Structures are given as structure tokens and as C-alpha cells.
């Protein structure tokens, strides 16, 4: 099967794209509701409908990306989210402060946006490691998906980046992975003015074969 683009909006995005045993969802929001709790409930209800429409399972969610207007409010979302997902098969993922676009046909008060990567081939095993409410890493079809890691024990961005990468060294050894095989690395930093501090530890870690990725202020 080739790439399938479904529910394509004119001049916009596909609602979901299927490719290589994966489904990639566009981020969904629910600004018609006022509170973060109500928006989270509305988004997850919509995903229930979409999973049914496209024949997907919550137990096959591999990775979650959540952008929140204020990630300090994460607990309000997390309580609802962890009741919604399959508790035996939690995904990896990240939740960061990132201001979602503030206009839509149904309202301008967008407090969060949520997207998923979902496995589509039930014959392929999904392995989840270090499972608590979420999980540290998910392995599926030859790919590993890591939850975002932080290192707040030190003060500067450069020191924190070095600490995070050192932690990944430990995790790669634990899970039998190689940093040379990292395909994409996304970084979310508090202040883009300090972007230059990333280069030294990042280059020292990856050398001549760095991954693709993005660094954004979030």
C-alpha cells in the first residue's frame, strides 16, 4: 500500500496520512469549549470517532505530541488523558508549551492541540519499555520512539543539553540502540536567544552524521 491522504482540507492538511504501517494525525483542537479540561475531553472524544472511522485502536498509539498554551496546566490534561488511553499500552510522547494557532471556524480560545502516531499493522509487535502512566520508549516495525527527556539539575542550556544527551547514552545502551542510528531529534527550548549553547554538546555527541530535526522555542 502506498501513501494515503485522507480527509484532505482545501489549502490545508490531511486529517490523517497512512504510510508504512503508520497513521499520522494532524493536531486536533476544541476551542468551542472554554476550559482546558473541557477541551481535552472534546479532543479525545473526537479521536474516539476518528479511530472508529479509520479502524484504529488506542492500544496501538505509539507517540503523542501535545502543545499547550501553558504547559504548567499539564496535570489538568493528564488526568483525563491517562484515563482515556489504554493503561496497559501507554504511548511515548512530549507535552510542551507551544501557542497553538488562535483562530479556527469554531473558536479562537485554543488552549491545547493534540496529535498521534498510531500503528496500523496488528501483526507487528509493539514493545513498550519503562511503563508507568506513560512509557519511556516504544519500539515498532524497526523504529524506536522516545518520550522527551529533560535535565533540570544544572542551570545553563548547554549543560542541560549535555545532561540530556548523556542520559540518552545510558538509555541507548540499556535498550541496545546506537546514537549513529538516530533519524530525527526535536528540541524544545525555553528561550531561542540561547540557541547557540546547543551546538557544542550536540555536535560533540552526534559528530559528522547528525539527525534531521527541529529546534523551536516552546
Where are these regions (language model features)?
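N-terminal presequence-like segments and the immediate start of the first folded domain
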Residues: 1-63, 67-166, 170-183, 188-218
